[in-house]
């Protein structure tokens, strides 16, 4: 499944909406997403599963690129 992760680049600062970034990652579950991203200095705000029409819509974005991280 593909997940969209909303995050802040600096894990030590309070989240500011204008600085929120996104990435796409393939994983089994939200827990798997967190496990794959642990060790990165980011502050995960929200993990959104993408499927169906929503996934197709996101694929049309020029920023859609699935991050490849092995388990």
From Swiss-Prot:
Reaction equations catalysed: RNA(n) + a ribonucleoside 5'-triphosphate = RNA(n+1) + diphosphate
**Which Gene3D superfamilies does the annotation name?**
RNAP, epsilon subunit-like (3.10.20.730)
Q: Which InterPro entries match?
A: RpoY
Q: Molecular function terms in GO for this entry?
A: DNA binding; DNA-directed RNA polymerase activity
The leader peptide range reads none
Asked whether the keyword Nucleotidyltransferase is assigned, the reply is: yes
Q: Member of which family?
A: Belongs to the RNA polymerase subunit epsilon family.
Summary of subunit composition and partner proteins? RNAP is composed of a core of 2 alpha, a beta and a beta' subunit. The core is associated with a delta subunit, and at least one of epsilon or omega. When a sigma factor is associated with the core the holoenzyme is formed, which can initiate transcription.
Name the job this protein performs. Answer: A non-essential component of RNA polymerase (RNAP).
| Listed name of the protein | DNA-directed RNA polymerase subunit epsilon
Q: What is the lineage of its organism?
A: Bacteria, Bacillati, Bacillota, Bacilli, Bacillales
């Amino acid at each position: 499944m593909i997940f969209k992760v909303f995050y802040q680049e600096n894990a030590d600062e309070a989240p500011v909406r204008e600085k929120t970034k996104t990435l796409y990652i393939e994983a089994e579950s939200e827990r798997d997403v967190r496990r794959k991203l642990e060790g990165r200095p980011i502050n995960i705000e929200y993990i959104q599963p993408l499927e169906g029409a929503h996934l197709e819509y996101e694929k049309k974005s020029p920023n859609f690129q699935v991050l490849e991280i092995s388990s």
